[in-house]
Amino acid sequence: MKLHKFYYSVSICIFTALFVCLNSFAQNTGKRVIKGSVVDANTGDPIPFATVSLKGTTVGANTDDKGRFFIETSIPADIILFSFIGYQTESRNISRGTEQIINIRLRLSIIELDEVRVKPRRVNYKNKDNPAVELIKKVIEKKDFNRQEVYNYLEFKKYEKIQFAISNITEKFKQGSQFIKFRFAFDNLDTTKRIGNTVLPVFIKESLSDYYSQKDPKAAKEIIRAEKITNLNEYFDNKGVSGYLNYLYQDINIYDNEILFITNKFLSPVAKSAPNFYRYYILDTLSVNNINCIKLFFEPRNKQDFLFHGNLYIIMDSSYAIRKIDMGINKNINLDWIQEISITQDFDQFGQQGWLLSKEEILIDFGIIKNSLGLYGQRTVSYKDYKINEPLSAVIFKGPEKIERFVPSANSAGFWESNRYVPLTKSEKGTYTTIDSLKKIPEFKKKMKLLTLITTGFYDLGNIEIGPVESFYSYNSVEGSRFRFGGRTTTGYSKKITFDAYAAYALKADLFKYNAGVTYSLTPGTIYQFPVKSIRLNYQNDTRIPGQELLFTQPDNLFLSFKRGPDDKLFLNKTIKAELLNEFESHFSYLAGYSFTRQSPLGNIHFTTNDYSSYTNDISHINISELFLNLRYAANESFYQGKIYRFPFPGKDPVIQLKTAFGSKSIYNDYDYIRLQLNLSRRYYVSVIGYTDIMVEAGKIIGEVPYPLLFIHTANQTYYYQKNSYSLMNFLEFVSDQYISLNIDHSFNGFILNKIPLVRKLKFREVVTFKVLYGSLSKNNNPDYNAELFKFPTDESGIPLTYSLDKKPYVEAGVGLSNILRIFRVDFVKRFTYTGHPNVSNHGFLIQFRFDI
């Protein structure tokens, strides 16, 4: 019995072993290899990412970038299929042989594409084993070879046209009583710009440029040869408007990782990290101007991020160059005043070289409410006459990246007709004549003067203008109600010389103040035309709050009259100043001059070397006589020239400023010293998470001076947010003779709040701020160690109100929301150090009027 069981077990083992061996042999003899290539039947070009599959099975593969495929399988099948979007599917019979080579030529399908957006299924989207992702990775891998910066030298000509039109013009709007005298303007309506929408062109700017670039050392230069613009220079800074449009419509290089567009940084769909932020879908293959391309649709993974959506048309060869782009942005992005954006770029091959940009069109629909009255903007750029790798002289690249060198005939009647690359439409031509006609109508002039008053604070009376109106009334606790009235001459009086003056009276202090100045232009242009070269002489008898330094705001301002904490310290300055301003096209400038100030204390400020709490003055005033030199460099800066201030647009380059002053008894100063200040500021864009403004400043005083001549650190006791001031520091709270400071202001552009349902509909934008100040005061300049110096201010009990920063830095930080009601920013700020000082606020809210896109 046992022997029987033994033979039975052995038989089972032998049978099993034979079965496994035979089965393995059968599998090995059935395995086969199929390989080959897939190419375009018309051009012979390889077709990457084509699908190769065995009919009736799940076995298959995709062709590589050279159109090659390889399949190894033991699954029986008789037919192999070859397919790719836009091509006719082909099939071939296959045998049971061990290796077969099949080369297939696919023919294009004839497909009529409707004007619809294809929305592919998004179920279980993943990057792994995704042909669309593999394709975009090839584009990214090759992009450094396809961008124009790859060439050692590059030269081309460029024609740019920017135009704006009032959109959604209705019959009711046209019949409005306010337009009775302007009805002729509606004869220039255009219905071709936007399908189903009537627009009224109101602005057009054209320019012709020569562009040069070199790879090593990296340099670029654009020389504007001619420019034509609708002229409203009496009311607006035409150059400033042009500069803002260039800032708004910056050149788009799709091969860059990040694209600066409408003041925000967007991640490019061909950025190195793009597959982590975008989804990609291969939609079709089609011919774009006789070039076979793969149409690749892309969209953001998160619709609230600063990303594009649209189509890339990728050339079907080993270059993986981009033939065409059409893209826009998602309506859920936190962009203000914008309803819709469309961007189109076409690339052409010039000679046997690579694919270079030939045409670009950007359309922006500005508006608050969709389908209501808005503003429609269009930028069209055409490129031609490319010269590649023809050596260029180094002289070309000297100076700023963009300069004007107008050809003599640029303003002649026939110049633009023969030189613009694309003819103007009838309505575009009419824009120039319509604006010229409107300027002759008295009613239009009145409305423009009113608009100028609202936007600039000045009202034009012809040869003079009065303002700024926001300074006509203000209040402080020392002077009480303060009334001021002033104005200046306009270019209607003289383009070379400008007079300005104001008079002010304070009720409580019973003081009369005034200012008078004259500025003379040393160039044929006015004192407002860059580059400015001018001399100025000015006399001022007025008060100043110690430590208040305002940006783009007059100190006599109704909105700055509301303050927290005591506001009882003023200097009364009687100053005569002579200065020379010299600006260069490179955006380097210097301001040199001499000033003499007789400074007196006012309110609860006293000049005493004894007990400050006695509130008496040992002397009535000090004499401050200085020679000064200020240097500034802001490479490639563009700006809007306002009536008082110059408003720069943030650029890619840092702004560097050095201020120096020399005071000496030999020039009738009461003290001997040298004062130095260095300031560096720059904006950094951080792709989808916004941008950061950083400012670093340092200062040093060499000499022995009283506290009015020390660095009185910039404080802000108002409720209006000032970026360059310390929001919770009191006036005259801190002084130093040397310091260094860091100011960081970051805007997230809604990156966080856009992820929160409902909240994102408000389109708020998060901001964070951080300000730190390190300072010190030497014993020579500290009244506690030097009895000859004025005592620091105290209250009546002798408690100090002014301090040095020797022990620790001053630190404050805040969080806030901008884009509230589209125009306001509110910050909550907390003070972290020196919180025990008298009369200080350790936290608070501040507001700012701020216009962002």
Could you tell me what each predicted segment is?
Residues K31-I34, A41-G56, I75:
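Short, ordered, surface-exposed loop/turn motifs in non-cytosolic proteins
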